[in-house]
C-alpha cells in the first residue's frame, strides 16, 4: 500500500511539472507580452521592466527561475494591482472557499436525498420529476445558470439584491455552483441505490422481517454512498474551478478572479 501511495504521489508531481512546463513554454510562444510595443512605453523602459521580471533571459532559464521562486513561496507581483500575488490570493480566497464549501455541502446533501427518493419511487411521478430536473442540471453549464438566475431574480423580479461588497448575497452563486454536482450525485445515488436494493443481503434482511427504514438507511444507503464518496474529490475541483466564472458573473470585485480590464 505504501509503495502504491508513493508511486501515485511521484506521478502526481511529475504530471504537475509536465503541465507547468508545457503551459509556460506555450505562453512564451504567443506573440506579444505585458510590455510589448503596443503600449506607450519607451525601449529603455521596456528593457528595465524585462530585466526586472527576468524576461530578458532565455526561456528555459526563465522557467527554472519561475519554478525556483514558486517553490520558495514567491508567486510574483500582480501587473494589475502591483501587490504580491500570494497575498492577493490569500486575501480573496476566503470568499471563493466559502462559496465552494457551501455549494459542495448543498450538492451532497440534496443529491443524496433526491437520489434516494428517485430510487425508492422508481418509474413513478417523483422519480420522473427528479430525472427531468437532474437532466437540466447536468446539461446547463454553471455560468449559463448563474446568468439566468441573475437576470430573473435580481434584475427582472428584484427578489434578491445584486451582489455588492457591502451587501453580499451567496444564494445565487451557491445554486449555480451546486446545480451540476447535485444533479450528478442524484443520478449516481439513484443508480447505486437501485443496485444495492437488488443485492442478496437486502433480500435476506427483508426476509428476516427487518424494518423497511432500517433496510434502506442502514444497509442500502450506506453501501450506495461509496460511489458518491469517490466523486467528492472531482466535485470539489469542479466547484473551485467553476467558481471563478460564476463569481465573475454574480459577485463584485471581492472574489478570487482577475480583473477583466
Q: Which sequence ranges carry the predicted segments?
A:
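Alpha-helical transmembrane segments of integral membrane proteins
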Residues: 2-3, 90-126, 142, 165-256
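Hydrophobic alpha-helical segments of integral membrane proteins
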Residues: 9, 45, 49, 59-75, ...
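Generic alpha-helical transmembrane segments of integral inner-membrane proteins
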Residues: 9, 13-26, 101, 105-109, ...
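Hydrophobic alpha-helical transmembrane segments of membrane transport/permease proteins
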Residues: 15-64, 158-172
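Membrane-water interface at transmembrane helix exits
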Residues: 23, 27, 31, 118-119, ...
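An internal, D/E-rich "acidic patch" concept
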Residues: 56-112
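Generic hydrophobic transmembrane alpha-helix motif, especially the helices
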Residues: 131-183
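A short, hydrophobic C-terminal helix/tail in secreted or cell-surface proteins
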Residues: 257-261
